[in-house]
């Protein structure tokens, strides 16, 4: 699905698979509208035959065999914190995804269409105190037709629950004396920021965080006010996610390269999207590396190469 639409995608736009989950709130049924990046979706299948999967995570309801690959199935309604509409019990499909080099299946009620949306129309999520949805699992929102809201999910946090980021958290600090200076990193996922901050801190860097491209540009201005023309001596590189509300990583890099104060700064893309097109696009735009979250050893190797080159 990603390959079919990738060549048409413009800078600062995202294509989302629009899918629905039917829930109940105070006894009243409602339709939840959600989106996931097309680049992360491999296929959509009917409900498969499930096998038991021993886990204490109640939203993992089993595993299934897809062409000899065993894939865990996540009940998205449970994960988000939705009380399901039982009248829709038989209306279920599975969205097969791959991100962070991990395949997973997500149980939803229906997939409607593919939407092309500008990142500037995606806002960070905010909810009323009474809302029952687990707010930590929502990374952004955007308005669609009839003044409805589509929610973009932070699916990366599931990997943390599954302990698939443990290698990053437990990575040994073998270069602390060599690695020093400032690093700016951008990511809208709280889970990804936590993992990255932990690793960079172990490597000896001082860290400035940003939650999207706009915030990243603002943080750069703050660093320039702090260091002036000496910023070059202090800020070693920038690490940026690709998918972010308000301003995505590609547009952030484009803006960066237009500003002579910052155009020299090496930029590493650190993304959950693991397709060749995204990596090639990043290199064409001038990124020094495109990494798939999160391989701690490879990440450290890339940092070492950049610092050696700029020494």
From Swiss-Prot:
The keyword Flavoprotein does not apply. Disruption phenotype: Deletion mutant is fully chemotactic and forms swarms the same way as wild-type strain. Mutant appears however to change direction frequently and shows defects in mouse colonization. Keywords: Phosphoprotein. Residues 182-308 form the Response regulatory domain. Coiled coil: none annotated. GO terms for biological process: chemotaxis; phosphorelay signal transduction system. The modification 4-aspartylphosphate is found at residue 241. InterPro entries: Chemotax_regulator_CheV, CheW-like_dom_sf, CheW-lke_dom, CheY-like_superfamily, Sig_transdc_resp-reg_receiver. Residues 13-164 form the CheW-like domain. Plays a role in chemotaxis signal transduction system in order to colonize the host stomach. May act as a phosphate sink to control the flow of phosphate to CheAY. This is Chemotaxis protein CheV3. The lineage of its organism: Bacteria, Pseudomonadati, Campylobacterota, Epsilonproteobacteria, Campylobacterales. The gene is cheV3.
């Amino acid at each position: 699905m990603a390959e079919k639409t990738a060549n048409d995608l413009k800078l600062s736009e995202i294509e989302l698979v629009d899918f629905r989950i039917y829930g109940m709130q105070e006894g009243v049924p409602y339709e939840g509208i959600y989106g996931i990046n097309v680049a992360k979706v491999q296929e959509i299948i009917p409900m498969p035959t499930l096998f038991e999967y021993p886990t204490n995570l109640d939203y993992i309801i089993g595993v299934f065999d897809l062409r000899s690959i065993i894939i865990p199935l996540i009940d998205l309604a449970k994960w988000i914190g939705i009380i399901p509409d039982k009248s829709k019990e038989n209306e279920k499909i599975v969205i097969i995804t791959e991100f962070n080099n991990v395949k997973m299946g997500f149980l939803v009620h229906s997939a409607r269409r593919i939407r092309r949306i500008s990142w500037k129309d995606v806002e960070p999520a905010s909810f009323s105190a009474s809302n029952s949805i687990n707010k930590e699992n929502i990374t952004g929102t955007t308005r669609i037709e009839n003044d409805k809201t589509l929610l973009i999910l932070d699916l990366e946090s599931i990997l943390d629950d599954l302990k698939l980021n443990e290698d990053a958290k437990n990575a040994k600090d073998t270069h602390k004396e060599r690695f020093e200076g400032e690093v700016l990193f951008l990511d809208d996922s709280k889970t990804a920021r936590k993992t990255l901050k932990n690793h960079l801190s172990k490597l000896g860097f001082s860290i400035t965080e940003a939650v999207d491209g706009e915030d990243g540009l603002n943080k750069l201005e703050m660093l320039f006010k702090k260091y002036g023309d000496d910023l070059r001596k202090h800020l070693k590189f920038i690490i940026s996610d690709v998918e972010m509300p308000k301003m995505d990583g590609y547009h952030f890099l484009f803006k960066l390269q237009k500003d002579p104060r910052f155009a020299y700064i090496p930029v590493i893309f650190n993304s959950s999207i693991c397709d060749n097109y995204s990596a090639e696009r990043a290199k064409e735009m001038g990124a020094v590396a495109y990494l798939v979250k999160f391989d701690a050893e490879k990440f450290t190797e890339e940092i070492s190469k950049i610092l050696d080159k700029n020494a």
